[in-house]
């Protein structure tokens, strides 16, 4: 009996999702039993035994090892599924579990699609999350609610996998909204911190704007095609002409909100108020790439209108340049990495704009490894420096934290050095932009942003390792914890090997007919950026710090100030208008100030008729009778 490869892939992936869903219910902090305790629990160093007043024996343990074991097994299963797909050249597998609503004008079914996009992303997401979960066991060891934290991380991953494997708009929206809700819970994990709560609220409100776009796309698709199946909607491309601008607007708005494009970007740096593992997971392989992944899934809609390509290209290039220029002026190490994420998301959107969705997805996969590693390295450094995050106070980390410092250098070089993960995908995107005949402005913005990427990447290396430490706090943590080292080394392996592996075994990189100068652009641009950094460091003086360019980049192009000022100005203008037109205008004249004059005038009219003349009484009576007769005749006729 020969087993079909499609059946193997479907079974493995459904099993992965089912096990991941079932594992959520086992993240419990304690178990209770009468008498002897014979539960087959995972033994950890944090396990303890206590007896309460009812003589119930309670075992409390940290569920971190259980979460790591589950994700480890699922990661190996996902890699096995990916290898089966590669060996059999399977394009996609569509699975319909059930028709949820079948007797309605809109048929809603639970559809899953297992294609190359999902299978590659599944392996990357599970490996990265496994590493982050292992790091969390080291980082959150003193948190009393660590079991709930592991549960939320797992649910968050599950929502992202539902989003990426769904072929139904209903399930896509479920994963989309689930990721947003879980991000609120994770960012505000330390609920006693006002900054964490306000940052979580900012992220939710900003994502609501993006949700308007996704709901617009879903509503128009449902009304015109009576189907929630994404493949059916995309295959009806010839019937989309009247609706295409509105559908594209919805998709671009949704992606801009979820992937923090320029204009809706301030929520992404706000994620840093949560624990470092949350920042690593959100910035690498889950929530922030959901918008770009949605554009990759629906890239067929972007094939015809060139103006849409230009708009997306300019949006991505502006985002990349804005974030890169802001990152070079930051001093908080986590903020530099956060703005680096925004810049790389802009580069992914640029790839969509030039009609290369496969390159955007390629960059998603390579970016996940080194970005997660950079955040974990920053968390290790911050722990070791007693919560110090200022880049200027660091230095000499190579002797104090050899593993962390090596991984931090590797992650910083991944965006600019050849033969590392980020360079493979970024090289192809820049080469594709050079060969593009679309908007020149977006292409120039992307190239300048890439040069600035080398600046802030090398700036991290320079301040952390070339200088002597100026932090007075003692180094209270070391690298003896194997959970920290294992997580970093696993991600370092992915940073080194993923670019070559994906480009040679999974993706077929397109070839572009470009000049030798354009071919060497990905190598020339980082060198120019590093040279500019050294020149600025050599010639920098205390008087040059107050320059206009430095003020603009430090203040994020004054975007936040402009938005806040516009909101305040608009509120004051509306208040002034309300005060003049309502409180001190017609409402005041009609209401409080108008009742007395109106009553006086009516009283005078009434008094004028009460002067004691009989002829006036008879005249008013006759007039009343005539009016009544006229109304009666009018009604009867």
UniProtKB/Swiss-Prot annotation:
One short Pfam family name for this protein? Proton_antipo_M
Tell me where the transmembrane regions lie: 7-27, 64-84, 117-137, 146-166, 169-189, 203-223, 240-260, 276-296, 309-329, 345-365, 403-423, 435-455, 492-512, 520-540, 557-577, 617-637
* GO MF terms, alphabetically ordered: NADH dehydrogenase (ubiquinone) activity
- Catalytic reaction list: a ubiquinone + NADH + 5 H(+)(in) = a ubiquinol + NAD(+) + 4 H(+)(out)
What biological-process GO terms show up in the record?
ATP synthesis coupled electron transport; electron transport coupled proton transport
Q: What is a single cellular component term in the Gene Ontology annotation?
A: respiratory chain complex I
Q: What is its EC number?
A: 7.1.1.2
What is the topology of this protein in the membrane according to its UniProt annotation?
Multi-pass membrane protein
Q: Give the EC class as a word.
A: translocase
User: Hey, what's the signal peptide range on this chain?
Assistant: none
| Key words of the record | Electron transport, Membrane, Mitochondrion, Mitochondrion inner membrane, NAD, Respiratory chain, Translocase, Transmembrane, Transmembrane helix, Transport, Ubiquinone
Q: Where in the cell is it found?
A: Mitochondrion inner membrane
Per the record, the similarity remark reads:
Belongs to the complex I subunit 5 family.
* PANTHER family for the chain: NADH-UBIQUINONE OXIDOREDUCTASE CHAIN 5 (PTHR42829:SF2)
Q: Could you tell me what this protein does? A: Core subunit of the mitochondrial membrane respiratory chain NADH dehydrogenase (Complex I) that is believed to belong to the minimal assembly required for catalysis. Complex I functions in the transfer of electrons from NADH to the respiratory chain. The immediate electron acceptor for the enzyme is believed to be ubiquinone.
Q: Output this protein's name.
A: NADH-ubiquinone oxidoreductase chain 5
The organism is Strongylocentrotus purpuratus (Purple sea urchin)
Query: Which gene carries the instructions for this protein?
Result: ND5
């Amino acid at each position: 009996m020969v087993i079909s490869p499609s059946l193997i892939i479907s079974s493995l992936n459904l099993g992965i999702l089912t096990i991941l869903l079932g594992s959520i219910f086992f993240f419990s902090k304690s178990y209770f039993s009468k008498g002897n305790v014979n539960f087959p629990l995972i033994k950890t160093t944090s396990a303890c035994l206590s007896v309460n007043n009812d003589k119930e024996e309670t075992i409390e343990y940290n569920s971190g090892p259980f979460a790591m074991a589950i994700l480890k097994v699922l990661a190996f299963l996902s890699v096995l599924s990916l290898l089966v797909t590669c060996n059999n050249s399977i394009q996609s597998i569509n699975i319909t579990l059930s028709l949820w609503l079948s007797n309605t004008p809109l048929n809603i079914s639970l559809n899953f699609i297992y294609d190359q996009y999902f299978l590659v992303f599944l392996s990357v997401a599970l490996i990265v999350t496994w590493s982050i979960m292992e790091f969390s066991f080291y980082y959150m060891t003193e948190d009393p609610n660590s079991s709930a934290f592991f549960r939320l991380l797992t649910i968050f991953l599950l929502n992202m996998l539902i989003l990426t494997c769904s072929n139904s708009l209903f399930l896509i929206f479920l994963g989309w909204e689930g990721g947003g809700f879980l991000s609120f819970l994770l960012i505000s994990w330390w609920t006693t911190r006002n900054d964490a709560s306000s940052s979580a609220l900012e992220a939710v409100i900003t994502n609501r704007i993006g949700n308007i776009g996704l709901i617009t796309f879903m509503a128009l698709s449902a009304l015109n095609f009576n189907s929630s199946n994404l493949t059916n909607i995309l295959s009806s491309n010839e019937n989309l002409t009247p609706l295409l601008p509105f559908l594209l607007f919805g998709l671009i708005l949704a992606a801009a909100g979820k992937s923090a494009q320029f204009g809706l970007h301030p929520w992404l740096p706000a994620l840093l108020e949560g624990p470092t593992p949350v920042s690593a997971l959100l910035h690498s392989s889950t929530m922030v790439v959901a918008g770009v992944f949605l554009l990759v899934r629906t890239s067929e809609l972007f094939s015809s209108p060139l103006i849409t390509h230009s708009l997306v290209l300019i949006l991505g290039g502006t985002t990349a340049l804005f974030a890169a220029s802001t990152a070079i002026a930051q001093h908080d190490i986590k903020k530099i990495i956060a703005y680096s994420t925004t810049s790389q998301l802009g580069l992914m959107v640029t790839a969509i704009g030039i009609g290369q969705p496969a390159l955007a997805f390629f960059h998603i996969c390579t970016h996940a490894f080194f970005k997660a590693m950079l955040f974990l390295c920053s968390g290790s450094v911050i722990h070791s420096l007693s919560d110090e995050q200022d880049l200027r106070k660091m230095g000499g980390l190579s002797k104090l934290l050899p593993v962390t410092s090596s991984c931090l250098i590797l992650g910083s070089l991944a965006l600019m050095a050849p033969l590392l993960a980020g360079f493979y995908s970024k090289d192809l995107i820049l080469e594709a932009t050079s060969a593009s005949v679309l908007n020149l402005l977006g292409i120039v913005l992307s190239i300048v942003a890439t040069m600035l990427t080398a600046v802030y990447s090398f700036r991290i290396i320079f301040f952390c390792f070339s200088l002597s430490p100026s932090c007075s706090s003692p180094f209270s943590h070391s690298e003896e914890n194997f959970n920290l080292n294992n997580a970093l080394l696993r991600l370092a392996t992915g940073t080194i090997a993923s670019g070559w592996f994906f480009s040679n075994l999974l993706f077929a990189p397109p070839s572009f007919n470009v000049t030798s100068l354009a071919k060497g652009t990905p190598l020339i641009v980082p060198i120019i950026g590093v040279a500019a950094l050294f020149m600025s460091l050599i010639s920098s003086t205390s008087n040059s710090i107050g320059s206009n360019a430095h003020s603009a980049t430090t203040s994020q192009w004054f975007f936040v100030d402009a938005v806040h000022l516009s909101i305040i100005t608009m509120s004051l203008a509306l208040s002034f208008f309300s005060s003049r037109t309502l409180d001190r205008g017609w409402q005041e004249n009609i209401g409080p100030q108008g009742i007395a004059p109106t009553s006086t005038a009516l009283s005078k009219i009434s008094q004028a008729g009460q002067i004691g003349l009989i002829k006036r009484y008879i005249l008013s009576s006759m007039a009343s009778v005539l009016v009544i007769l006229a109304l009666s005749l009018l009604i009867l006729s």
